[in-house]
Amino acid sequence: MKYIIEHMEEGFSEWVILEYSQILREVGAENLILSSLPESTTEKDIPQRLLKLGLRWTTKDLKGINEDFKDLELLKDGRVCLLDPRATIDLQPEDATKFDYFVFGGILGDHPPRDRTKELKTAYPNLLISRRLGDKQMTTDTAIRTTQLIIKDRIAFEDIKFIDYPEFRFNKNEATEMPFRYVLDKEGKPILPEGMLDLIKKDSAQSLDDLLM
């Protein structure tokens, strides 16, 4: 099971670095590809924290990934799943046998959401098949975590425990509500990337848009 994140933007915010780092730790560097980086991108543009975790990246788009990564199975029409908030069918455990790759357009962590999935579906009408992860916005690491639970662990979406729009309180007068859905851990707490809570606390005076950029 391979995951592809269509980065499609310049630079890496601290938020994105923490998310990608967590994804790499959870799925393994061999199972994650960052694609569609700006053509001018060189290795020095990639954060060292991600390189040390083994991040594999390319400026190629979905159709060109196999040119840079000969070890990967070919991306075949109808065997690539696009996680699309506007899809009509939710991802199910039985989809594990239907898809080789799962593509995330960066749209799941945007607030407000940008319709990047529409761009991808237009660009690759035969390659991609859309599936949904419920009707709430997720961060990219949450979306990949949810996909793993469904596809790898064979847990139905409706059986996964989530929390929507959790509030993180730092003191009596200071709290931040996150406008996303998160998976809950065994203790009933939302799963965040390592260091994310500190970042939210540090930047709680900023707007969420500033934090994500």
Curated annotation (Swiss-Prot):
Keywords: Cytoplasm, Methyltransferase, Phosphoprotein, S-adenosyl-L-methionine, Transferase. Signal peptide: none annotated. One of its GO terms (cellular component) is cytoplasm. GO terms for biological process: methylation. The modification Phosphoserine is found at residues 204, 207. Pfam families: SFM1-like (PF04252). Coiled coil: none annotated. It is found in: Cytoplasm. InterPro entries: SFM1-like. GO terms for molecular function: protein-arginine omega-N monomethyltransferase activity. Its EC number is 2.1.1.-. Its main location: cytoplasm. S-adenosyl-L-methionine-dependent protein-arginine N-methyltransferase that monomethylates ribosomal protein S3 (RPS3) at 'Arg-146'. Present with 2520 molecules/cell in log phase SD medium. Belongs to the class IV-like SAM-binding methyltransferase superfamily. Protein arginine N-methyltransferase SFM1 family. This is Protein arginine N-methyltransferase SFM1. The lineage of its organism: Eukaryota, Fungi, Dikarya, Ascomycota, Saccharomycotina. The gene is SFM1.
